[in-house]
């Protein structure tokens, strides 16, 4: 009888253990199934004018899609750019979006992502196949490099130079941010092409000076602008090529402190928070920008790759072109501010719908983003 009771007790304990193990396994599976997607963002700065706008729209998308986001600010310093991919991969990110500086950095970034099985997409950048064939080939064959979202920077450069020429400016100085930066090189090509085209068809010739580099802070932007003006007191225009917005803030402060506000026409890329006031008072002549949703599209590419919705080729990658907006008057800016500053151009429901688009339809939605597009959805 004692033996029978012992056997029954052992069976009961074993049954309880099996049920407990089965329950724990089910709970673990459920926990795994409901694990949040985690996407890392490697950005020059998440706090300057453009960077904070990028963060705002990414955070809104992450909230709408229940995605965890992690940011690394790398200042467009090469070693920080490459280490950011390592940091985000080690932190358990399923994918990352990155705004690198030089295309050469992408060799390390892509290798890190491929080794760690982390999906990757560029924003505000694309690897040029002609100038960086090795990096391009590596990106194309990686099963984890999803694609790149970028602007037509050459066209952007041409348009800004043309705006200055049409306003009667003749001697144009140029302030970049980092020598060799992939986006700056394209904009510079556009500035030069704009000068060549203008001079080929107009008698009032214009001149573009060689670039000086002002980094990505307001202090370095200011000191570089001061040096440019002191060395070239007869300039009547300055292009501040970009750098996130702080470089321009410093350059404008330099121009005002030197008594040159309204005398030196300034154009730039990356909208300032006070662009309306700068246009009214002559601080700015024109600006291209409104492109802070570019990283949103890169985010959607990576999100859908993680979900298995967008196949990742080993013989190419997705290439998405993002449109610029151009503002040259307070009236232009008022329309922009209503739909891109006071509110975001996409609400939560629209972000969810965007995440459900095919890749081709995502490209179409990207191409048509404009003030009129947002108006039509409100």
Predicted feature residues:
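Short, low-complexity disordered leader/linker segments with a strong preference
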Residues: 1-38, 111-116, 364, 373-378
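Hinge/cleft segment of the Venus flytrap/periplasmic-binding protein
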Residues: 35, 299-378
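Extracytoplasmic "Venus flytrap"
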Residues: 36-61, 65, 70-83, 87, ...
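An alpha-beta-alpha
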Residues: 39, 43-45, 58, 146-202, ...
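Periplasmic-binding protein-like
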Residues: 40-42, 92-100, 119-124, 173-176, ...
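Hydrophobic alpha-helical
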Residues: 96, 101-115, 191, 214-277, ...
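Flexible loop/hinge segments that line or gate small-molecule binding clefts
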Residues: 111-155, 177, 276
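Flexible loop/turn connectors
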Residues: 261-330
